């Protein structure tokens, strides 16, 4: 019992030290580097893309959307292998690893991993949790298979939800998120790398249309969501870095502990 109390005291000591060392001033807004500060102008491009993509959900634009997809559908892309299932991750992978090839990045590997994880979480939250689960929009391939042939009684949003979650394009969101991260990390000194990443992301969007998985407007909205997710991750990075630095400034000590009947070594770890 005494030994357990001693361990508890050590734990409480560690927690109290943590509370004393954690300083909220370390994540104060004035400490944010200029390149990471929020600016309303940075919302213009992703906002415009999302707004343009959203118009495809309304009747005046919907007719034009169907006409465009009709032309694409005649190319027969619905039977091709969807390699964009894998290519969508190439820009994000480049954002994390391009400096391993000698290209200077704005941040170290740990920061880039944290930036990518945050950006992906935000993008997925917007794209999947918020929109795909709540906006009913039939996929082009399903439209041509069932609706255009008069077989609408065979499918429904409740019974076949994956057939009706076309808006927005998740693949496009992932690809453009990665492309924007490449631009932010490397674009200042290596603009060609940003251009290449955006070219890959654009190719992913085009393939989603060609393969009858998405309408053109789905891709626009997905691109906007991806760019916005990357920029939110970029804005949050200084706060996350300082938060984790505060949490993981570890003090490790090994102390002898005795209760009269024996002695042990106790590890004290302060987060």
Located regions from the model:
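N-terminal targeting leaders of membrane proteins
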Residues: 1, 8-104, 112-116, 132-134, ...
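Extracytoplasmic/secreted envelope proteins and their assembly/folding machinery
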Residues: 94, 110, 114, 127-128, ...
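Alpha-helical transmembrane segments of multi-pass membrane proteins, especially transporters
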Residues: 115-120, 222-223
